[in-house]
């Protein structure tokens, strides 16, 4: 009996020292389970006399009920404690300011394209998407760039086969639209173009916007007026603009347009010119009746100038720190 009393004391101490509900379950199994200590003690009572067996059975069963009761009480206390700790850890201070909701923003290239499109739509232009995979005829031949023309070398073309390629310029859409539409024509063609070049000012994929006007009595003065109007709107009226003669196979005369920075340095912005009579002939437009002008500009280049970006690759690296700067522009 002394050993039994000592055992009950040990069980009570174990229950009191328990810090987890799982520990209480282990105590219950250890002492009260089928293979538990008290169960084993009960089996030994068969060797006792009838009176001793009866006496000890009553004591043990009473203690078992007390142990079960104490385990349940301890479980309730631990459950309350765990809940209190959880509530404490998840408490929200309602006096603190709420978390600011982040809003998405457009990529600076998308912003620039949308700005340019909106400007030309106000002037009566229509905007149309165009295929990025082209054939040799629309990308080169119809634009007065014949098979062995040296201008092809500067395009660094990605070829799929002998006829299909990733377009090197949005000018290819000029041919398609002039074959589909009858003059007067006034369209812009924004889109991606591809050239095999990669450095701080070039990427294998970049964006262009091509503009085309076909009508009677269109001249270079009309073209200059449109370009001045656009550049003043985009960069501000204080910008200095310079036209200089250039050469493109599909326009004649041709010019490149520069803006002059605060250091007096010329920065090329776009190319333009009157559409070559051979190009009009290729789309069955009579150059004696109609004339046409065209211009093309690189979106990344003017975005770099507008936002003061020095490396074109920054547009395509998806650095959130970089992109966040343009969220509200």
From Swiss-Prot:
Which CDD domains does this UniProt record tie to the protein? PheRS_alpha_core
Question: Cross-referenced SUPFAM superfamilies, in alphabetical order?
Answer: Class II aaRS and biotin synthetases (SSF55681), tRNA-binding arm (SSF46589)
The entry's free-text remark on the cofactor is: Binds 2 magnesium ions per tetramer.
NADP keyword on record: no
* Quaternary assembly: Tetramer of two alpha and two beta subunits.
Question: Among its keywords, does the record have NAD?
Answer: no
Which cellular component, as a GO term, is one annotated location? Answer: cytoplasm
Q: What is its EC number?
A: 6.1.1.20
Q: Which domain of life is it from?
A: Bacteria
Q: What is the lineage of its organism?
A: Bacteria, Pseudomonadati, Pseudomonadota, Gammaproteobacteria, Enterobacterales
This chain belongs to which protein, by name?
Phenylalanine--tRNA ligase alpha subunit
State one molecular function term (GO).
Answer: tRNA binding
Q: Which family does it belong to?
A: Belongs to the class-II aminoacyl-tRNA synthetase family. Phe-tRNA synthetase alpha subunit type 1 subfamily.
Listed GO biological process terms: phenylalanyl-tRNA aminoacylation
List, alphabetically, the PROSITE patterns matched: AA_TRNA_LIGASE_II (PS50862)
Signal peptide (UniProt feature, chain positions) = none
Q: Sorted alphabetically, which InterPro entries does this protein's record hold? A: aa-tRNA-synth_II (IPR006195), aa-tRNA-synth_II/BPL/LPL (IPR045864), Phe-tRNA-synth_IIc_asu (IPR004529), Phe-tRNA_ligase_II_N (IPR004188), Phe_tRNA_ligase_alpha1_bac (IPR022911), Phenylalanyl-tRNA_Synthase (IPR002319), tRNA-bd_arm (IPR010978)
Q: Which UniProt keywords apply?
A: Aminoacyl-tRNA synthetase, ATP-binding, Cytoplasm, Ligase, Magnesium, Metal-binding, Nucleotide-binding, Protein biosynthesis
Which major enzyme category is it? Answer: ligase
């Amino acid at each position: 009996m002394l050993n039994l009393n000592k055992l009950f004391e040990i069980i009570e101490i174990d229950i009191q020292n328990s810090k987890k509900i799982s520990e209480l379950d282990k105590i219950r199994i250890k002492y009260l389970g089928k293979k538990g200590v008290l169960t084993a003690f009960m089996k030994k009572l068969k060797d006792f006399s009838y009176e001793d067996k009866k006496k000890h059975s009553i004591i043990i069963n009473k203690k078992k009920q007390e142990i079960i009761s104490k385990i349940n009480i301890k479980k309730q206390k631990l459950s309350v404690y765990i809940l209190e700790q959880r509530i404490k850890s998840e408490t929200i201070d309602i006096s603190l300011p709420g978390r600011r909701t982040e809003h998405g923003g457009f990529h600076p290239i998308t912003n620039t394209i949308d700005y340019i499109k909106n400007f030309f739509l106000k002037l009566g232009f229509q905007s149309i998407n165009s295929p990025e995979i082209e054939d040799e005829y629309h990308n080169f031949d119809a634009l007065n760039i014949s098979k062995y023309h040296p201008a092809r070398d500067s395009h660094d073309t990605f070829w799929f086969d002998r006829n299909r390629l990733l377009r090197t310029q949005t000018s290819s859409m000029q041919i398609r639209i002039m074959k589909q539409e009858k003059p007067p024509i006034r369209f812009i063609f924004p889109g991606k173009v591809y050239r095999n070049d990669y450095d701080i000012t070039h990427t294998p994929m970049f964006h262009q916007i091509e503009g085309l006007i076909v009508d009677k009595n269109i001249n270079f003065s009309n073209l200059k007026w449109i370009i001045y109007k656009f550049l003043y709107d985009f960069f501000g009226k204080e910008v200095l603009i310079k036209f200089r003669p250039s050469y493109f196979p599909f326009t004649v005369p041709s010019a490149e347009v520069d803006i002059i920075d605060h250091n007096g340095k010329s920065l090329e912005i776009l190319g333009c010119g009157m559409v070559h009579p051979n190009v009009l002939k290729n789309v069955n437009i009579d150059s004696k009746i109609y004339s046409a002008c065209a211009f093309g500009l690189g979106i990344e280049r003017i975005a770099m100038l507008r936002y003061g970006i020095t490396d074109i690759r920054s547009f395509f690296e998806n650095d959130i720190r970089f992109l966040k700067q343009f969220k509200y522009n």
